[in-house]
Amino acid sequence: GGGRGCTAGPHGSLYNTQLVFDADGTLLLRRRKITPTFHERMIWGQGDGAGLKAVDTAVGRVGALACWEHYNPLARYALMAQHEEIHVAQFPGSLVGPIFAEQIEVTIRHHALESGCFVVNSTGWLTDEQIARISPDEKLRKALTGGCMTAIISPEGSHVVPPLTSGEGILIADLDMGLITKRKRMMDSVGHYARPELLSLNLDNRPAATMQQAAPFPANHGSASDEADGPGERASAAADGASDQRVAVLRGAAR
């Protein structure tokens, strides 16, 4: 399995999008970041809950979130409740300096501990040449350095391999899936350590739609007047509100 980020969107709107592929290249998940952060809102639209799901891959159940979605505990819990085994995280990198890398590390290690899953996190990296092309202002250039924390975290919250904090590269590691059971035996946030009768999550995972198409009226709906109905039919219609609907249809037709 593998994940990547991109910008995608049909019909004019763009969305910050994550793609999850299986080992054979099959696209298993296309999800949109549910809330663009700060200045991102000038470019990207809001995603829906349809992408808040874990999918089965050749290497295990995989879920994904982007950047500050990890600061939304309900979004993280939605994936935890679906028993994700590998969590794909992505942050921009080359931003704000070392403090951003520290924040990323805290965030992904905490999610690994809380969910009892592996976290595979990737961050971007800008070269000096790329930074110079982005801005001629030296002060702005400083804001485009550091902030890189590409890492693989175990369910126990530790680095499986040393993190990549500068430059381009790829981290490769063997994942001992038995560590998931070991962690959840002690603390399972969506199992024996959960209290659903006290605290629970309500997720609307329907794809967003800007139009709902109503079912058409039957061909003979409203063709008969109330006077043609017998007393029993009129009483039944009044009881269930159907008479009001017929009057509304007839008035609309008269116009």
Residue ranges: model-predicted function:
Residues 7-89, 94-110, 149, 186:
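Active-site catalytic loop in hydrolytic enzyme cores
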Residues 1, 61, 67-171:
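CN hydrolase (nitrilase-like) catalytic-core segments centered on the catalytic cysteine
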Residues 1-8, 226-229:
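Short, compositionally biased segments
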Residues 123-255:
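C-terminal beta-strand edge segments of enzyme domains
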